[in-house]
Each structure stands twice: as structure tokens, then as C-alpha cells.
């Protein structure tokens, strides 16, 4: 399935570029896959955009041991904003959360802000990510 595909890509990238520091990112369903893959891959950083908390992410999750950004719109019509906020704050060391006020699930008209927030987060992280 998708998790196995993600793990295979990570293994391939590490071998291809001889690089241990991988950054994982995913949007919606991809955020759930990236979060699950992080437990095996041990990324240098993780970005989850509109993670499907309460839909696909329903069980307790171990917090990845890396810098982690959660991006969420507060008008998401598919993923409940309050549920995501509670989930994020439930971790002993909560991930960084970027809220885009007024943004819906697909961030229509807000992709520039989304991009800027992710780039700012990654600029604070380890050098050498792939």
C-alpha cells in the first residue's frame, strides 16, 4: 500500500543521494502516511498539512522525534479544526502548528501562505534534508 511505497521511496532516496537527513511531508491522506512512515524512517523534519485527524488518524500516535509542523485551515470542511487543535495540544511536546485563518481543506487562494509557512519552518531545521 501507500505506506510501503513511502518507505521504499525513503530507502531509495537515502541510497541514491547517500543522505541520512530526510524531510517527510504530506497533505491530507498523505499527511497520515508521512506521519506513519516517520516512525520507521526517523526523518530530520516532518510537515503534515491538513492531517485527517478523526478520519484516518484515529488511534493515539507516537510523536515523531524530529521538528514537526502541522498546517491547518480553520475553515476546513473535511477535517474538523477543533479536533486537530486538541490532537496537537495532546502531545507532551506538541508540534508547531500553523493556522491559516479562513483557509479551507485545499487552501484555495492560500497556497502562497502555505508555502511561505513551510519554507520558514524548514529554514529553521537541519541542513542537508532531501
Per-range role (PLM):
Residues 48-57, 73, 103:
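Active-site nucleophile loop of the alpha/beta-hydrolase fold
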Amino acid at each position: 500500500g501507500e505506506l510501503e511505497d513511502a518507505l521504499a521511496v525513503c530507502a531509495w532516496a537515502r541510497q541514491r543521494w547517500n543522505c541520512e537527513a530526510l524531510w517527510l511531508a504530506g497533505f491530507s491522506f498523505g499527511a497520515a502516511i508521512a506521519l506513519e512512515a516517520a516512525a520507521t524512517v526517523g526523518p530530520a523534519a516532518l510537515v503534515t498539512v491538513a492531517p485527517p485527524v478523526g478520519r484516518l488518524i484515529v488511534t493515539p500516535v507516537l510523536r515523531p522525534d524530529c521538528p514537526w509542523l502541522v498546517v491547518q485551515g480553520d475553515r476546513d470542511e473535511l477535517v474538523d479544526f477543533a479536533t486537530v487543535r486538541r490532537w496537537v495540544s495532546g502531545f507532551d511536546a506538541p508540534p508547531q502548528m500553523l493556522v491559516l485563518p479562513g483557509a479551507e481543506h485545499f487552501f484555495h487562494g492560500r497556497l502562497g501562505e502555505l508555502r511561505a509557512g513551510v519554507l520558514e519552518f524548514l529554514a529553521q531545521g537541519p541542513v542537508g534534508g532531501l
